[in-house]
Swiss-Prot record:
Expressed in the brain, in neurons (at protein level). Detected in hippocampus (at protein level). Widely expressed in the central and peripheral nervous system. The different forms are differentially expressed in various cell types. Isoform GP95-TRKB is specifically expressed in glial cells. LRR repeats lie at residues 92-113, 116-137. It comes from Mus musculus (Mouse). The record marks Y515 as: Interaction with SHC1. The lineage of its organism: Eukaryota, Metazoa, Chordata, Craniata, Vertebrata. ATP binds at L543, G544, E545, G546, A547, F548, G549, K550, V551, K571. Residues 454-465 are annotated as: Interaction with MAPK8IP3/JIP3. This is BDNF/NT-3 growth factors receptor. Residues 484-494 have a biased composition (Polar residues).
Amino acid sequence: MSPWLKWHGPAMARLWGLCLLVLGFWRASLACPTSCKCSSARIWCTEPSPGIVAFPRLEPNSVDPENITEILIANQKRLEIINEDDVEAYVGLRNLTIVDSGLKFVAYKAFLKNSNLRHINFTRNKLTSLSRRHFRHLDLSDLILTGNPFTCSCDIMWLKTLQETKSSPDTQDLYCLNESSKNMPLANLQIPNCGLPSARLAAPNLTVEEGKSVTLSCSVGGDPLPTLYWDVGNLVSKHMNETSHTQGSLRITNISSDDSGKQISCVAENLVGEDQDSVNLTVHFAPTITFLESPTSDHHWCIPFTVRGNPKPALQWFYNGAILNESKYICTKIHVTNHTEYHGCLQLDNPTHMNNGDYTLMAKNEYGKDERQISAHFMGRPGVDYETNPNYPEVLYEDWTTPTDIGDTTNKSNEIPSTDVADQSNREHLSVYAVVVIASVVGFCLLVMLLLLKLARHSKFGMKGPASVISNDDDSASPLHHISNGSNTPSSSEGGPDAVIIGMTKIPVIENPQYFGITNSQLKPDTFVQHIKRHNIVLKRELGEGAFGKVFLAECYNLCPEQDKILVAVKTLKDASDNARKDFHREAELLTNLQHEHIVKFYGVCVEGDPLIMVFEYMKHGDLNKFLRAHGPDAVLMAEGNPPTELTQSQMLHIAQQIAAGMVYLASQHFVHRDLATRNCLVGENLLVKIGDFGMSRDVYSTDYYRVGGHTMLPIRWMPPESIMYRKFTTESDVWSLGVVLWEIFTYGKQPWYQLSNNEVIECITQGRVLQRPRTCPQEVYELMLGCWQREPHTRKNIKSIHTLLQNLAKASPVYLDILG
């Protein structure tokens, strides 16, 4: 064997790999302090021998200390001190536990840089005193101090005060050693001249004009004598303070309008605790228009603006230099108010070319005014020849409300020669005869068509030719439309509340090999696909269109024994290829086996001729995303009449637990949805919610998807890191999506990460960022969301436990179902 093969063959490659692995473990162990063990996020030192004498520090170029979230120290009798710089490197630290050790002293600034600390446990140490200054800047959930030999003094009186005023430390039996070296319950501690301080400001309210100066005075008192300091937050204006033992003053000069609404506090602090008195600063200033842009189209046309001013400015619009009189079709809407800043828009309902022009906004209050102008173009003037033909009659485009040229038009008609008038008269006679003949023919044709329609009321489905509207029964949700080949049908995004009906397809569901490997003999008798006669299906109107084909609202006869006909949603197959037909039949078998009260019901198929048809139950109120938006705080912007009632928290919990129930069922059947979102859930009567996906959502909600390559559309805003990076879809990835669905529900249908582009969303999710808690979301539900969004799939909450928790929360709040009317 050659020397090269001897040292570079496959066996040696495995040996080198093993050596590198051992070297990696050895290097990691060297980086961790003696008597401690380390991981990427945790340090624990529990071996008493040889033990540690100082707070553990990581070696340079080892694990990043910023990633450490928990430090556990136990049985370290020689650890006595935490110095100022011992903990500062662990800025991500959340849990610090030092128990059964020799800790005697903690430096005042030991935790100054550990703002993420939430849990501290110093049980059974040697602490005789502990100052509140260690913890005053922290938002602690737990501070456990039992088993320490505290000395009865004013230094620990703050612990007694803390127990009396708050629930933390919870149910702790704290003791201190009195002058006789006997244990005394901290609750009974009485120390003379040891009480809380007081602080008082001279003025409870402060109003000043921009650019002026003001001086605040504060007096403090208490025993022990407190320290006085000013908490000015992020005050922009220049300021300076002077303090003595019991008096202090704060002078603010050249006050900025940016400081209006900010709070200024005078704080008195001593060993026992602190007291503060606050004043709100109100700054009056002239208005400025900081933002005015060209109109954008959403539910209405909107010219967006932002105005600053205090007192609130009066707004006036001008159109082409003249005062714009607002009405219900053109009006100012203020959407967001932030003390002195107003975000809104000039809303225009269906503007035309008549509304094109210059729009000027003027904002005015007692301190001044500001104005800005924008040019708006909503649509071109009618008539395709206008732009290309300079001789096109200008009179066609005169403003209908300006009759100044009527006389000119009459004068021009008088200039026509008499011979032209005679020719025109002859042409008019011929036109009259032609109109009479055409009207007679049309009337006869209409009569024949009415007779044919009456005879064909229950005739064949008619999908090969134009699909007609058969009936107006049971369909008060929106007007019916005639649907024909080549005509423009109403899109699903423009329809009524039932505009989008979506059901499970092969696209978002990973094929279950256990299911597709079975034979017909293995299927249960009640799960065979039901075949529906084509003449029993009568179309009413088109609901939408996806990549697969169209979805129609229809009436289906003889489907249920107890009803002559029921409303259904039918999905047609556009692609008639052999592969598409095979997929169609496989999907039908799959859907037949998915039977649950919170999964959209699949009735069967129609395979008599083309196109192939799937029949699903009809959910009256359409997709959940539109339903949430229509019953949220912004519904007034979309409603044409009285806005619907806003969803309550209990109703949102009721919706959430139904979706979770459906996902528990899918997981039990070993199916992965891959596209769980509110747009793919449907709402029926009495707030009944079911999971589905007809695939139309990729067209209606195109901004929710991220195109990869030529055809693949991924819902990245609902996907976990492993699905984005490795296309790995599991039940755990569905759990992540369920967490996002909960976020959608409690934001009334907002798009996740709506303020970010798709690329920014991918970066955020892969870097570990999560969505913030919605304003209306209970803390328990947000913690549930966080449990769904754990980076490691195996650490995410179990789908059954999610459903159980949501079910319990929903039961605790009764649901009133009259919201749907």
